[in-house]
Amino acid sequence: MEAIEWLENFLLDFQGSIVFISHDRSVIRKMATRIVDLDRGQLQSYLGNYDLYLTTKEENLRVEALQNELFDKRLAQEDVWIRQGIKARRTRNEGRVRALKAMREERRQRREVMGTAKLQLDTSSRSGKIVFEMEDVSYEIAGKTLLKDFSTTILRGDKIALVGPNGCGKTTFIKLLLGEIQPTSGKIRCGTKLEIAYFDQYRADLDPEKIVMDNVADGKQDIEINGVKRHVLGYLQEFLFPPKRAMTPVKALSGGERNRLLLAKLLLKPNNLLILDEPTNDLDVETLELLEEILTDYQGTLLIVSHDRQFIDNTATECYLFEGEGRLNKYVGGFFDAKQQQANFWASKAVEEQAKAKKSEPLKEESAVKNDRTSKPKSVKLSYKEQRELEQLPQLLEELETKITTLQAEIADPAFFQQAHDITDAKLKALADTEAELETAFLRWEELEEKKNLADGKA
């Protein structure tokens, strides 16, 4: 995801024109100022951002459907006229006949809107309340620590996204849970009554030599979902595989078609634990949105590995973020909520470290000041410079508090973490520095106030 964000910001800074193709809605929303839509062989240009495109496209399709309905009604009326009796045919208007032929040709060439996949899950019996327990789990391979002293409890109904760069250990984490590999140290306990459906990013569950139909039904004509028998060809049409395409070998399919096929096969399995490892690769936006709806309503436990930020945000209720050197932290919410919490966490850590550093300074200076106050009461009076400083400190404190409020508001904005890392890091550092500066200024104000009170005989 860091690479995606870097590319976004690199392209946003680019001064020339950019043409890009993407199914990543976050990328499109952030970058596109004009969208060219390819629909049924026709290109249509939409000015504006992605959300405006969706609204305009929906309205265009509504108008098109209405126009087609009126056209078909008129065509049916003309067909009735041309089939009238002998008398009507003798007196028919040749121009009207030619117009009817043109209408029939126009109707023949019309390309209907491509359907969307119709997905449904074969639900299973409920698992036990505890699905997985991990206690101080670590995992190392080839001298590299992927996981260090991690503990968690995954409960029935949890929807967790594993987020991190390639190679950080997301798939390894899943293999640890499933018992395919053993941890270097720590304990992992599995719950009861688990029925697992696993979407593998490598599509290992598909036989490339078999045709689409046989991959799903294993040579049978019927499949069963939720206790109801279906013909396999009818089921595959819901995943946008017409009968002819259902007879095609898997090795001839596109990446998107293979992912749809894997979903078709996966969703047939009764399950209460669904593991999706990069399910969004090559899926079109309509199928993505339908999958999101299904996962939102899913009653079982869900584990997701994905680089699609919008997909995670729409499906996950908790995120596990891989932060390097074996660190894995848990954050409540979708992707953007998790990233904001992560930034706030590390910003507060930075403030704590700075505060500790100040407290650990040698105490000699503080002791000398105290001795000076007790042994030299005559010199306790504020100097002119200190008096000026004391007068200016309230204004400085107010300015620092205003700056902190402004920075906190910027960081709380969900769009904040869509900026380049150097920008977000600079803002987070500025917040930590300003909070430290405020603390220092406040301590100085207290010190000067105390000195002034001593001079005035109030202490």
UniProtKB/Swiss-Prot annotation:
InterPro entries: AAA+_ATPase (IPR003593), ABC_tran_C (IPR032524), ABC_tran_Xtn (IPR032781), ABC_transporter-like_ATP-bd (IPR003439), ABC_transporter-like_CS (IPR017871), ABCF_ATPase (IPR051309), P-loop_NTPase (IPR027417), Val-tRNA_synth_C_sf (IPR037118). GO terms for molecular function: ATP binding; ATP hydrolysis activity; DNA binding. Residues 357-381 are annotated as: Disordered. It catalyses: ATP + H2O = ADP + phosphate + H(+). Residues 357-375 have a biased composition (Basic and acidic residues). It is an enzyme of class 3 (hydrolase). Its EC number is 3.6.1.-. Belongs to the ABC transporter superfamily. ABCF family. Uup subfamily. Might play a role in ribosome assembly or function; this is missing the first ABC transporter domain compared to paralogs. This is ATP-binding protein Uup-like. It comes from Haemophilus influenzae (strain ATCC 51907 / DSM 11121 / KW20 / Rd). The lineage of its organism: Bacteria, Pseudomonadati, Pseudomonadota, Gammaproteobacteria, Pasteurellales. The gene is uup-B.
